Amino acid sequence: MRFPLRFTLTQARHRARMKRLGRKRYPTVLMLEPLYTCNLACLGCSTERYSGKLSDRLPPEKCFAAVDACGAPIVNICGGEPCLYPELKELLEGLFARNKHVILCTNALKLEEKLFGVVPPTHRLLLMIHLDGMRETHDYVTNRAGVFDKALDAAKKAKQLGYNVYLNTTVFRETKVEE
């Protein structure tokens, strides 16, 4: 998968800086999981990925502390479902203010409500939408009918609005080769 050129250039600058500093090991991407709450119960996720309580989420200041301590130029927000994080707008704005590139891993069911019209498209944000196969397979894997169509509609709308959109697929035993 090819990432946007700006993401790639940022990574290259980070690696060059680390080399100049003589560091052999350093983080390049921070996987930030601010919550373990999800609106789906997919086959590929362990129970703690979708059964967490919203009240157990990390507050934005702890997220920012982790980001600042890590120093990676890219932050991948995943967990449960990031669009359920009540402080998502604050978190994204804080990451952009720190000049971070952000990958938001989402099932796309709440993009309309939580992102579109709330956080404008920017070259610093990449929406990574999970589509685990075509309609029948994806709906089976997510344990809910209609999720494929909702996710695909959200991906199309995000593109129309100017967001960077990538699709991510997990291949399961149930995935058909043709997909």
Name every feature range the model reports, one short phrase each.
Residues 82, 108-113, 127-144, 173-174:
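Conserved radical SAM core fold
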Residues 154-178:
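Conserved strand-turn element in the central/C-terminal portion of the radical SAM core barrel
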Residues 58-62, 146-150, 175-179:
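Soluble or luminal CAZymes and related metallo-dependent hydrolases
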Residues 2-123:
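Conserved alpha-helical substructure of the radical SAM core
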Residues 142-160:
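Glycine-rich S-adenosyl-L-methionine
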Residues 122-124, 162-163:
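A short helix-to-beta-strand connector/capping loop
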